[in-house]
């Protein structure tokens, strides 16, 4: 079953300077997201990854083409309807927010009862489960502004899980996490995907994270689809060397059999 679809999507920022000879941040992008899959979006800087997130969040709308979730155009949804379907975990959560962790995570429940002013026992239970799953339950009464970057990242993920979306969009989810929490984050995402059937879109510069976690990958370059396929099909030495402009080698992880990308560093 298809959860979301991009169909011939172009996007250009108004009055923006042309990038690399063309004004489009995305051009002719088409792909489907299947229910329950983990889908990675890769590409160098200025490839269009952030624009894709902004389109899914409806911060901006396509210049041409359509984006649908559950067969409904994003432009036809109310904000509450959109938030019940899609949750976005940004790369950076603003510092200095005047909320406790519990209060911020409970905000993920607002789309389910936009006219309700008080949390129900069910809301509290869902929020507690989300905090426990992300390892921030012991920080529930702490102010978000005093947390470390890694802790704020896990709180943002907890809020998204409390939203109970059909589609979870993650922008560099391990960017502020140490090695231990990177491993735990990947394990959590796999568990959410497996137990809840949540479709996950992972936007990342980390080719190896995407290769280890994702069922399919979309590689963008200059706003266009360079390749769409399995990690084995997309993480190709010749293709990556061309797109990223540096020599790489691709081997197999001895434990998982998944492709691993290594850069030929110069001394």
For every predicted segment, state its role.
Residues 168-172:
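Catalytic Walker B motif of ABC-type/P-loop ATPase nucleotide-binding domains
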Residues 164:
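Conserved catalytic motifs of ABC-family nucleotide-binding domains
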Residues 65-73, 82:
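Conserved ABC transporter NBD signature motif
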Residues 117, 143-147, 151:
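Conserved ABC ATPase signature
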Residues 42-44:
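The feature captures the beta-strand-to-loop junction immediately N-terminal to the Walker
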Residues 57:
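Helix-to-loop junction immediately C-terminal to a conserved catalytic motif
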Residues 243-267:
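ABC ATPase nucleotide-binding domains
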């Amino acid at each position: 079953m298809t959860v979301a679809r991009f169909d011939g999507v172009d996007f250009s920022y108004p009055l923006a300077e042309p990038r690399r000879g063309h004004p489009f941040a995305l051009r002719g992008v088409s792909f489907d997201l299947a229910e329950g899959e983990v889908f990675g979006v890769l590409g160098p800087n200025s490839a269009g990854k952030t624009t894709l997130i902004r389109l899914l969040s409806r911060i901006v709308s396509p210049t041409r083409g359509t984006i649908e979730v559950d067969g409904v155009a994003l432009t036809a949804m109310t904000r509450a309807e959109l938030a019940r379907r899609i949750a976005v975990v940004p790369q950076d959560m603003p510092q200095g927010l005047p909320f406790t962790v519990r209060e911020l995570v409970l905000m993920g429940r607002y789309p389910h009862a936009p006219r309700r002013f008080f949390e129900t026992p069910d809301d509290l239970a869902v929020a507690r489960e989300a905090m426990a799953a992300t390892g921030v339950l012991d920080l529930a009464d702490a102010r978000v502004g005093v947390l470390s970057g890694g802790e704020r990242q896990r709180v943002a993920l907890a809020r998204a899980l409390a939203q109970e979306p059909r589609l979870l969009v993650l922008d560099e989810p391990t960017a502020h996490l140490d090695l231990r929490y990177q491993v735990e984050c990947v394990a959590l995402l796999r568990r959410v995907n497996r137990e809840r059937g949540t479709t996950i879109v992972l936007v990342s510069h980390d080719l190896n994270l995407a290769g280890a976690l994702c069922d399919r990958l979309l590689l963008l370059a200059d706003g266009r689809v360079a390749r769409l396929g399995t990690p084995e099909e997309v993480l190709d030495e010749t293709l990556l060397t061309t797109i990223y402009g540096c020599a790489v080698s691709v081997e197999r992880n001895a434990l998982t059999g998944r492709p691993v990308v290594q850069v030929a560093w110069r001394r």
